[in-house]
Structures are given as structure tokens and as C-alpha cells.
Amino acid sequence: INLPALAFVPPKPTGKAVLYLHGLSMAEDAKPGGRIEKLMKKQNAIVLSAELRGIGETETGHDKQDYGRGQFGRDVQEIYLAYLTGRSYVGMRTGDVLALTQFLSANLETDGNSGKIHLVGQGEAAIPALHAAALAPEQFESVALDEMIATWAEIVATPESLNQAAS
């Protein structure tokens, strides 16, 4: 699968890299003065802002706001299709995170740095980012997760939650 991405490169990169995964769009925080620019300047790092399958440019054509409104989330069709093929949609997205990590690592000049990636997952991209970090902890220097469920116990205790099928 082809995944869209934007690369932000500082004038003098230090060899550090951030994989930035937003739950709505790779360009969401890319505006001047936005979170991506701040990350790039703070760490003098290359930032790869990418979209996982079903997010941003790879969303399907139907009107997701109306189709999946409520408990199941916007990706309900894709989630059920994944299960029909014997796979988990979260698992597929986790594979996307790991593939993007490999791409970034392979194209990174480390200049003595660890070569590990700083991973940022936000919203719908946070859970696949969490799974990728759990499956390949040696790949990541740090992991930051924003706007996701607080605990799995919260999902079990709540019979219905927003976007529960995407979790």
C-alpha cells in the first residue's frame, strides 16, 4: 500500500527523526508555527508527517461523517472488510507505522545519533502507534500519544464509545 507523507527538513539536520502521525491529515499541524515546525526546530530533526491507511488522502469516497456516525466510527466499512480478510484494521495500520519507521530509518543519516525514531501518534493514529512501539521498542527513542483512550479498561467498562471499532 502506498502511504502519503510530507517531509520537513531543517536547514542543518542533526540526524534525529520524528515520525508524526495525525489522526485526520498529514497537513493538519503543518502550518507555519504549528506543532510540526516546533518539533523540527526544537530537536533540529527531520519530521516525516504521514497518513495511515484510511486517514486523510486515503479515506474512501463515501461520506464518512454520515455513514459511520456514532459508536463505530468513520472507518466501519474498512474495519469490517479487514476482518472479512482475516486481519485486524488496527493491525494493518500498525504495519503501516512499522513500514514508515523502516523507511525513515533507512533514509536517515545518523551522525552518531542512536538512529531511533521519535514517534508521535495523535487521535485515530495513536493506537496503531502504541502497538508499533510495543512490537518494535528497539526502533523508537520516544513515543508520544495524544487524544486517545486513557485505558483499555475504559473501553471494556463502557458498552458504547465513539469510534470504538477503530480501537
Please state what every model-predicted region is:
Residues 15-107, 152-159:
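Cap/lid segment of the alpha/beta-hydrolase catalytic domain
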Residues 5-14:
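Short beta-strand-to-loop junctions in surface cap/lid or active-site-entrance loops
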Residues 9, 36-40, 133-135:
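Short amphipathic alpha-helices and their capping/turn segments at secondary-structure boundaries
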Residues 5, 33-34, 130:
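A generic local structural motif
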Residues 12, 25, 124:
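Short, glycine/serine-rich, charged loops/turns that create anion-binding
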Residues 100-166:
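Primarily recognizes the serine-hydrolase "nucleophile elbow" in alpha/beta-hydrolase
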